[in-house]
């Protein structure tokens, strides 16, 4: 009787493996053409067991990324993913397109103003949405008033007034004595006051400027790395690395300001032709607009 009882118990244990609520394990098969066939099971909305077969083709895409980001991707997994292979897992991760989303802080207020403005102002906004800000001093994507070199370099159109027509002096300036208009004109813009003074970074500025222009800079360059490279020759007062507004990568040029022009000349001589991140740097003194 004991043997019959044990057999009955064993038969009951065997029946437990045929539980209809249990799903078979996922099967991954590697094909000869390099693709993978993944077979998995799931329950549909009606509670029926459904077999899902996916054929995956792996494509290797070579991409240049920041070395620090690549190092973090090679870290060992932890937590519930501890011990799993590197890369995303099909069970827990759904790989999709990388979408860059930059929300605005006051986007609700801006949307309300756009609706109140009407179609006329909305069309102007659509016309200006593709416009980019360009600095008149270093040609960077920022406002000229925020340029870090506004005190050391002159803007490109500084001498635009020098090419005025010869007969322009005979026309009375607006806002002066006897003018027929009531619009106010500042004294420094009136007739005869153009030569009364010069801007701080004008042509009378001292000639011992110590700003270097570095070109052929890698997209992965950082301001701290450039500072470390040039501080070997003297005290660096400012480092400006032009970046793209969309990708935040370097645009290929930078400005390095030294406290002493002698240090800048030595750095220009040593760093011109220096290899940095598989590129050859081109270093020269920044030229002011004439």
Curated annotation (Swiss-Prot):
Record bears the keyword Phosphoprotein: no
RRM domain residues: 210-288
Major localisation: cytoplasm
Protein name as annotated: Eukaryotic translation initiation factor 3 subunit G
A Gene Ontology molecular function term of the record: translation initiation factor activity
Top-rank taxon: Eukaryota
Single GO cellular component term: eukaryotic 43S preinitiation complex
Gene3D superfamilies: 3.30.70.330
Function summary: RNA-binding component of the eukaryotic translation initiation factor 3 (eIF-3) complex, which is involved in protein synthesis of a specialized repertoire of mRNAs and, together with other initiation factors, stimulates binding of mRNA and methionyl-tRNAi to the 40S ribosome. The eIF-3 complex specifically targets and initiates translation of a subset of mRNAs involved in cell proliferation. This subunit can bind 18S rRNA.
Region spans: Disordered: 1-34
PROSITE patterns xrefs: RRM (PS50102)
The family this protein is said to belong to: Belongs to the eIF-3 subunit G family.
Location(s), subcellular: Cytoplasm
Keywords: Cytoplasm, Initiation factor, Protein biosynthesis, RNA-binding
Originating organism: Neosartorya fischeri (strain ATCC 1020 / DSM 3700 / CBS 544.65 / FGSC A1164 / JCM 1740 / NRRL 181 / WB 181)
Assembly and binders: Component of the eukaryotic translation initiation factor 3 (eIF-3) complex.
